[in-house]
Amino acid sequence: MLEYKSFFFLLAVQLISISASSQETYKGPSQCGDMEVWDYSTGMCSPRAMSEMPMSMVMLHGNAFFVQTYEERPRGRDAFSIPNMLMFDVGKSVKNHYFNVDVMATVEKWTYPKDGYPELLQIGEKNEDDEPYIDAQHPHSSPIMGLTLSDTISLGDDRDYLKIFFAPRGQSTDGPVAFMHRVTGMVNPDAPLGHHIGQDVGHITSTVLGVSWAVGRATIEASAFNGTEPHPTAVDLPLGPLNSYAGRFIYRTSDRSYLMGSAAYVKEPEPDEPTLDHIWRYSASFYNEHVINEGWRFYNTFIYGLVNFYDNTGALNSFSEEFLFTSNWHNIWGRIEYLQRTSSELDILSATPFEPHWVTALTVGYTYNLLKWKDGKFGLGASLTKDFLPTDFRDSYGGDPLSGKIFLQLEGMKMWNFSSARSEMPKMNEHSH
């Protein structure tokens, strides 16, 4: 009964948010200036080349949490971790081309405990001892999560463009906007539990060659890439054959909301599982923002993900609803997750290994901005997560476990414009990240 209640509660929250997005006060990609376009892969405004206004841009964005976690036993543990990311972006326009180098970096390999960042029900990847991360989030590839070289070609006077990109490591064109780039995800130190079920898993991919074509309200993206996932604890940047493919379609339903859908064929995703030839990943997502009044904004993200042939299972599904109420000093946020797990993934020996079971995780959090300055902020936050488990999992977890986190957050963004038309160049959208 709880499973159905969780699903309908999640659906109700989404319907409320959709109705809110129809109001005129809502803002989104329309916040970009005349010399900017909306980059859906990073959820932010990006410079657009104009032949009569040559420009050079540098952008630096960082986000770090200093987190103390407390979890109920027997599966829980207490630990200190520092989830973090640093994005460095440099670009230059030449006529109607904008050439760009984007670097995504982290040092999580050195700021996470050996067993990973504590997060009950989280799965995915293996540590340096070749042991799977269970009830823990793996560190992201350190120090380089992504290195992308791109050429964005402006098509006419409108914001239509063609983007061609190559990444030794970067984002393939499947999945939603990655959690670390979503406004609703950037306030939460936890990665979504659906991270490896069609949601964010494509945001760190090896050897990506892709194209993005934006025309009017629609954007069509395609990429070829190497399907084998980079090892999260290896300090490397390997290249591989282009043996996997993905496509994504994005439609801007209004100036302040958009839909995204994707599909991907992924060849040999797990090198440790030679019998797994390929998997299919699918996702659908919706993003919007609503201005409540002059002081408060509401952001919302809804995500559905599906993976076929994962962990010897025909299909695994995940639903996620993220929200953020934010003002100048206060941030109220949360995540509602409803997804399938197998006992094999969670190392539960008392249940059928590969049978999917629905689990629910409800998270609510609050962050107070202690300090704010022009290019950054420093906040104090806390969150509580309550997990609701099926009967087959409850004995292993001692019931429906509760976990809590207390953290400090340091976030900042700085942009430098070296354009000769500097006075006419709009600033980067402050709500992009």
Task: Give the residues covered by each predicted segment.
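Residues that define the transmembrane beta-barrel architecture of outer-membrane proteins
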Residues: S56, D78-L86, S141-L147, H203-T207, ...
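Transmembrane beta-barrel strands of outer-membrane/channel proteins
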Residues: L60, A64-Q68, V101-V107, I164-P168, ...
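Sequence/structural signature of outer-membrane beta-barrel proteins
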Residues: V67-P74, E108-W110, R169-T173, P192, ...
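Residues on the lipid-exposed face of transmembrane beta-strands in outer-membrane beta-barrel proteins
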Residues: L86-K92, L147-I153, L209-V215, A222, ...
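Repeated loop/turn-to-beta-strand initiation elements of outer-membrane beta-barrel proteins
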Residues: K95-N100, D157-L162, R217-E221, D255-G261, ...
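Outer-membrane beta-barrel translocator/channel fold
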Residues: W110-Y117, E125-S141, A263-D272, D277, ...
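Surface-exposed coil loops of outer-membrane beta-barrel proteins
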Residues: K114-I250
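Outer-membrane beta-barrel "beta-signal"
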Residues: V364, G398-H433
